[in-house]
Amino acid sequence: MNNQLVPQNAAAAAAAAAAAAAAAAANSLKSRKPYTISKQRENWTDEEHQKFLEALTLFDRDWKKIESFVGSKTVIQIRSHAQKYFIKVQKNNTGERIPPPRPKRKSIQPYPQKQKHDGMGAFIPDSLSGNHFISSSSFATWMTYRGLMPNISESQINPSDLQKQLEQLQQAQQYIQQAVTTAQSSQRNGGLPPNPSSNNGGTTLTPNFPKIYAFLSNLFESNGTSFTEALSDLSMIDRETMQILMHNLAINLANQQYRDNHQTLSEQYRMKRDEDEDLNAIMISPRNSTGNINVSGDFYDNNSNNNNNNNNNNNNNNNNNNNNNNNNNNNNNNNNNNNNNNNNNNNNNNNNNNGGDFGDQNHSNMVNLGNYYNNHPNQNTINALYSLNQPSTLSNNPLNMVGNLNPQKQPPFNLNLNMQSGF
């Protein structure tokens, strides 16, 4: 009986000791500091997000480099934004590349480094060698991400083929570096770059730049046809120069400063184009030299037939009166007949002078309208309409739209009057 109680008491004592040790260990641990937001959250603009994506492709999870690349966000903000972006990509399964997480400090497996491209430094001209973005080892990865370089995995390349490609790449790098250096030195001296392959004869060949730029412009056209025939027509120096220009174009397109300048120039061009369109819209508007709207004389044209009929009636009446006067005055002296003829001629001349240069027939038509409707009930409207052709009343007329102008030189215009009965 006593032998059975001893193990039970020992087990209870051991359990009590373990509980006491756990309680002491819990009391010895420091309490975790609660999380507090020290800085207000700021929204990311589209430009900042695009910079973040490019930096993520270049530097993976190197937050310090990403911070210097973005420039407007801190490391804490970048890591928070990256965490939300990674969750969104995994949730939507959109296929964007997510860099692998960095290992712990005591991890056995090292962090996977990107494949270094040893030859990228030789492609860079001297003017861009100080740019950290272009001179970085991740430039080739960025070019591959943008589709400017083919993306080939290591499993698809044999070691022997890789060695040959590296040798060819080194030779190409050396050649291009010499060509770029020669072009820069000749540009500083004010000349054209010589042909590197023409060392035997001592003569220098200059590239045909108009032909090269014409080929490049056709190459970038959306509806361009095959360019193999045009490429075969180029000489060796033209092909080499075109390769250098295309490589410089790729470097410029990868430069952030170039993109910023391109965006600024595009905005300035759009503003200038809008200003020119507004100016053209003002100049095309139908206005005369005094700034008023110059419209055609539709009222005169619509009533021209009536005016001509009135003129014919008046002329017939005048002829009848002249005939009657001639019949009644047959017994008079020849001197009286001559005087009547002279008076008639003077009257005709006066009537012809009333027409002037004012729209040819329109002025005489308006005078006849004023005479014909002299006794019309709407006398004020007729007088105002008739006064447009009189120099003495032109400046005082309330319907005047063009100011003090010579009525004999003023073209007809439409008054758009609300004419009452009789018109």
Curated annotation (Swiss-Prot):
Biased composition (Polar residues): 286-295, 361-372
Region described as Disordered: spans on this chain: 93-116, 177-205, 284-372
Keyword field contains Chaperone: no
InterPro entries: Homeodomain-like_sf, Myb_dom, Myb_dom_plants, SANT/Myb, SANT_dom
Location of the protein in the cell: Nucleus
Keywords: DNA-binding, Nucleus, Transcription, Transcription regulation
Record SMART domains: SANT
GO terms for biological process, alphabetical: regulation of gene expression; regulation of macropinocytosis
Listed Low complexity bias regions: 177-202, 302-354
Superkingdom of origin: Eukaryota
DNA-binding region: 63-86
Domain HTH myb-type: 36-90
One GO MF term: DNA binding
Any Pfam family the entry gives: RVE6
GO cellular component: cytoplasm; nucleus
UniProt protein name: Myb-like protein G
Species assigned in the record: Dictyostelium discoideum
Species lineage: Eukaryota, Amoebozoa, Evosea, Eumycetozoa, Dictyostelia
Gene name of the record: mybG
